[in-house]
Amino acid sequence: WQHVLLLADALVVSEARHKTIAGLYRLIVEAPDPSNGADTLRISPWTAEELRTPIRHFIVADLVAYARQSNQWTLYVSLDDSLGAKDKGTRHLEAVDYHHDHTKSQGQKKPYYTNGTVHLEVRLQLGARSYAYDWRLYLREKTVRRLNRQRAPEHRLHFRKKTSLARDMLEGLQQLLPAGFQVYVLFDSWYAANGLLKFCRRQGWHVICAIKSNRKLADKQLSQWPQTLRHQRYQRVQLTVTDQRLRTYLVRTLRGKLTKLS
């Protein structure tokens, strides 16, 4: 635990944009060799779940206490994935592989792939407080097959889709979260699948998400609705953005049943 505490203290005080183990150990007075920190993370005797479980319980307990103190019961649950880019020559970290880069692919004729790791994260926002509640590492099916070639049968990995990992985290939150909160779940179009949407609705949670344009609403593709509604007046909706300024949006309201969600 000594090296874990050293790393935690260094992470708190470090102002470096890119934090490496060697860089963190340079901040520590009379620090041991940085390889000790790497070995602690690589061959630690505890599992990720053993560390995550008490953190999740602490976060929910703190969130409930803050809700009672501030009388704020509207909880925003945001779900998103993040791509952490690595050097093109990085090969020996198990989770590193080439992933589709949504950001760099925008506006390009061909998809762009970046060497790195992908993780999914669930964040909670209640009033002025924000929590990094939980996260999961995502491995491509190709990556799982490659890693399993070098593993014993009892230690082999199982491929899981992003939507499956997302639901796993939301199910854990649902089990810990007491009644009384009005919950809004936010995610992008990648997670707008039947299973995840129905799970959220069964809990009485609201969902705010993007939908891919080829999905159907009231038996018509979303991409066709702007033309159909072109004669309908826009509604002006004002929202307070992060810098507390009001921003006006022009929207049209449409109700119907969504179909063709994979």
Please provide the spans of the model-predicted regions.
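Gly/serine-rich nucleotide phosphate-binding loop at the start of the catalytic core
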Residues: 1-48
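Active-site-proximal, Lys/Arg-enriched surface segment
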Residues: 8-11, 44-142, 244-254
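Generic hydrophobic, aliphatic-rich segments that mediate packing or membrane embedding
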Residues: 20, 59, 73-77, 118, ...
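A generic secondary-structure signal
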Residues: 27, 61, 65-66, 168-176
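Electropositive, glycine- and tryptophan-enriched low-complexity nucleic-acid-binding patches
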Residues: 35-39, 44-45, 102-182, 261-262
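An internal, acidic/charged active-site-proximal segment
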Residues: 149-262
